[in-house]
Amino acid sequence: MLSPKRTRFRKQHRGRMKGISYRGNAICFGKYALQALEPAWITSRQIEAGRRAMTRNARRGGKIWVRIFPDKPVTVRPAETRMGSGKGSPEYWVAVVKPGRILYEMGGVTENIARRAISIAASKMPIRAQFIISG
C-alpha cells in the first residue's frame, strides 16, 4: 500500500475540499484515463484495490499509471476514549481528490480492454468517475 516514506509533521488538519482540480486534470502518460467527478478522500487501500483490478483485467498487455498519492494522514481515537487528551494517532493515509482529477491512466491496450479494466477500477472507488480518452 502507498504511504510517504517520511513527512515533516505526523498529524494534519482535516481541511476542506472545495472547487475543482486545476492540477493533475489532463492525461499525461497513457491514452485512456479515469477522471473523478466528485470530491473525496481516497484511501491507500482503495487506490491499491483499483490498481490490482486494472492489472488483473488487462492481463500482461499495457501499462498503468497511478496519478494520485496518499500523502494526508488520518488520525483515529481509540474506542471508548474520553474527550480531551489530544489528537488520536495516525491510522491510515488518504489522497485528497477534487472533481476533474485523473486517478489512473492506461496505455498500450485496445479501447475495449481499457474501458473494461477502468470501469472495474471505478467500481472500487468511493466516488463517481468517468472514462476519458486523450486527444
Swiss-Prot record:
* Lineage top rank: taxon: Eukaryota
Q: Which InterPro entries match?
A: Ribosomal_uL16, Ribosomal_uL16_bact-type, Ribosomal_uL16_CS, Ribosomal_uL16_dom, Ribosomal_uL16_sf
* One GO term of the biological process aspect: translation
Where does this protein chiefly localize? plastid
**Keyword set, alphabetical order:** Chloroplast, Plastid, Ribonucleoprotein, Ribosomal protein
Q: Which GO terms describe its cellular component?
A: chloroplast; ribonucleoprotein complex; ribosome
Q: What are the GO MF terms of this UniProt record?
A: rRNA binding; structural constituent of ribosome
**UniProt keyword Nucleotidyltransferase, yes or no:** no
Q: Where in the cell is it found?
A: Plastid, Chloroplast
**Subunit and partners:** Part of the 50S ribosomal subunit.
Please report which protein family the annotation says this sequence is part of: Belongs to the universal ribosomal protein uL16 family.
The name of this protein is Large ribosomal subunit protein uL16c
